[in-house]
């Protein structure tokens, strides 16, 4: 099948590459000509395990192409995915300017019947806006070309995105016709080996499903952090409590590890957007608001503990930060708790030694650019303060003991 993926960021590049691996002819489009030039040179703009190898292989096999020309990409395409960003607006709502700009361009350039798929995380009702935008442009061209808009939200985890795409838990498809459902199932069928994991529904429900999924996961994170804070007050072991509740099949162990709160490109943005969606429709989403408030406070819990132990003035103290990205296995520092912790410590005069196996360049060039008193080190053995929940595992605790033991002999 011939496919166009518009937007060559994280979602677009992973999706396009995985579709290409299954034998489809995929053209990834981006208005950033520099990014396209680099992709054509084999330079991948993001880090995701296994992605670079897969991109290069599919380019070599002539299944994956990159261009800045949408008209060129749409010539033979049956399906066009919109995978551009929906950044957070000043009021916390999702900014649809890029999605609607793409819709306008599709209406101006499409040359045959097309299924237009919203892959971006968008508020409920966006498909209607996309449809109206495309239709308006077609009317200006006096064109009666047929098209349909479909919602197909992504559920990719950074650090495991390729595996998530190639072996999905489910594929949610929101459409308004049997033709659209059939074409989408045809596209995704090669990803299923044993049984059908398609979940079909109306478009608005599909749009809502993405927000509901992320809100549930964020809620579990904030809940466990709240429990961990209470455990500390009453003298209970949060890890033992986690095991105790996680063994209940109704709860499970996923997303109940205490830490410094959630970050990344999705949860913070989507929680705010969902709260705004509710507000726009006259509903006060109290639980969602509480999830966000708990998370904001959790980012600075470790700073509060440091202040309690050493005082407000941290001049003369050096703190090691192990882990800059918002989670392991990625270089993504968007809304990473480490950013907030480091800035608060530096503001109080502290020196920082920071280590991350993937995200140091992101920190230097973007998220911590200009922040004073930071030394980026090349070895995890140079840092002791640990921010990520995975460092509190048995392996993490054992590792810390090794560091401390080694430090005594130095």
Role assignments for model-derived ranges:
Residues 1-410:
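Structural/interface elements that position substrates and couple domains in central-metabolism enzymes
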């Amino acid at each position: 099948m011939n496919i166009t993926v518009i937007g060559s960021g994280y979602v677009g590049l992973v999706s396009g590459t995985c579709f290409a691996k299954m034998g489809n002819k995929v053209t990834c489009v981006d208005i950033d000509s520099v990014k396209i030039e680099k992709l054509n040179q084999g330079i991948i703009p993001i880090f995701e395990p296994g992605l670079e190898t897969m991109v290069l292989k599919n380019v070599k096999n002539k299944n994956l192409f990159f261009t800045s020309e949408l008209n060129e990409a749409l010539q033979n395409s049956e399906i066009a995915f919109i995978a551009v960003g929906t950044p957070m607006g000043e009021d916390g709502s999702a900014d649809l300017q890029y999605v609607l700009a793409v819709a306008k361009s599709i209406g101006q350039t499409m040359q045959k019947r097309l299924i237009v798929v919203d892959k971006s995380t968008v508020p409920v009702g966006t498909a209607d806006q996309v449809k109206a935008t495309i239709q308006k442009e077609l009317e200006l061209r006096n064109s009666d070309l047929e098209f349909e808009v479909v919602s197909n939200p992504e559920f990719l985890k950074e650090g495991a995105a390729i595996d998530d795409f190639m072996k999905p838990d489910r594929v949610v498809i929101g459409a308004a016709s049997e033709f659209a459902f059939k074409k989408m199932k045809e596209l995704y069928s090669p990803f299923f080996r044993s049984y059908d994991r398609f979940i079909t529904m109306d478009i608005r429900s599909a749009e809502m499903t993405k927000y509901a999924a992320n809100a549930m996961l964020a809620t579990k994170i904030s809940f466990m952090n709240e429990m961990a804070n209470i455990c500390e007050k009453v003298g209970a072991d949060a890890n033992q409590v986690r095991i105790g509740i996680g063994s209940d099949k109704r709860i499970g162990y996923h997303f109940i590890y205490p830490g410094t709160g959630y970050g990344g490109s999705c949860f913070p943005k989507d929680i705010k957007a969902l709260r705004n969606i509710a507000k726009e429709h006259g509903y006060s989403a109290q639980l969602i608001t509480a999830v966000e408030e708990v998370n904001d406070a959790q980012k600075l819990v470790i700073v509060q503990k440091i202040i309690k132990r050493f005082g407000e003035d941290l001049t003369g103290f050096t703190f090691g930060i192990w882990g800059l990205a918002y989670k392991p296995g990625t270089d993504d520092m968007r809304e990473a708790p480490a950013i907030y912790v480091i800035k608060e410590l530096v503001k109080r005069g502290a020196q920082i030694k920071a280590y991350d196996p993937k995200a140091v360049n992101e920190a230097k060039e973007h998220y911590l650019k200009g922040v004073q008193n930071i030394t980026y080190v090349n070895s995890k053995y140079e840092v002791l303060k640990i921010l990520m929940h995975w460092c509190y595992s048995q392996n993490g605790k054992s590792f810390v003991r090794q560091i401390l033991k080694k430090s005594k002999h130095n």
